Amino acid sequence: MHKIQIKYEKIGEKNSDDYKYDFCFVGTAHPKKYKFIKKMSEQLKSIYPKQYIYFFFPSRIVYFYRKIRNKELHKAKYNEFNFQPLKGEKMNEIYEKSRCVLDSAKDGQIGLTIRVIGALGAKKKLITTNEDIVNYDFYCPENIYLYNGKFDLDNIFFKSKYKRIDNVIY
């Protein structure tokens, strides 16, 4: 974990306002996560049109099995998914070139996802479905938006730049 944090911190040190992507999502395509990320992506297209989404399945067999068994994936297209994990350097590049990170925790997940930790280290804004995030000391409404099924585009999150958090918390 320590090595990951150091890489994300280096990304945060380079932060600029020159973004290739308005947001990114890199993660395993769990059925409900897929559904939420797709829904968020669609709702954000008008203000965040430059999107990088990398849905990962560990194998094609898992993809076909889940597509048949999970209603959230019935309409999913094969070309939306990747069957090789994103390598570290490519992942760093995507985070570096993104304004914001999308996150959707799995059902029943307790605690933070790696995307939350990465966004904090890289000093990126974060949109998440994790309701518990407001209870953490690093929570800042300028940086973290709690998604509850729809977006309030007048929210301070969309009107402000990333606000640095106190190093004591970080």
Please describe what each predicted stretch is.
Residues M1-Q109, T113, K125-Y139:
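Nucleotide-sugar donor-binding catalytic core of glycosyltransferases
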Residues V101, G121, K125-Y170:
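Pol beta-like nucleotidyltransferase catalytic core
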